């Protein structure tokens, strides 16, 4: 990937309600990433697991080939996605990753996040791959699972 352009970054969105295990799943993926690759993670908020602190030890961003950025200003899917766009563009520019993982809040609907990622601006930059939805099997019978 040249310094001038960012193209076709394999991108996965990891969704699920709060407590479904999104952060834990992302940590697992990051711990098994190829050593020669740079991965970026865009998170809506740092959850109980704490991807940033757990994996990166706080101040050594990028030293393990992992860059984490939090979306400031609330939900990724709110306010036309502007906070998400700002954080994503900054993360891509800084990290120049080989793969991008996105963890939206468990409170919003991922369709708004996917709409931002499918916008013209990101068409050549991102290669959207599978959207992974995690489900807490203990709560599968709750109405919200059927509604979303």
Regions inferred by a protein language model and the residue ranges of each:
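Nucleotide-state-sensitive switch-loop elements of NTP-binding domains
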Residues: 2-15, 20, 24-148
């Amino acid at each position: 990937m040249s310094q001038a352009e960012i193209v076709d970054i394999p991108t996965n969105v990891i969704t699920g309600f709060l407590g479904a295990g999104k952060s834990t799943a992302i940590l697992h993926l990051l711990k098994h990433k190829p050593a020669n690759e740079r991965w970026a993670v865009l998170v809506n908020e740092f959850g109980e697991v704490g991807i940033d602190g757990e994996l990166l030890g706080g101040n050594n961003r990028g030293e393990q080939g992992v860059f984490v950025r939090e979306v400031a200003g609330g939900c990724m899917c709110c306010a036309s996605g502007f906070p998400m766009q700002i954080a994503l563009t900054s993360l891509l520019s800084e990290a120049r990753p080989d793969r991008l993982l996105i963890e939206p809040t468990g409170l919003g609907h991922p369709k708004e996040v996917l709409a931002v990622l499918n916008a013209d601006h990101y068409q050549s930059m991102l290669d959207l791959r599978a959207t992974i939805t995690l489900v807490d099997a203990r709560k599968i019978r709750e109405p919200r699972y059927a509604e979303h």
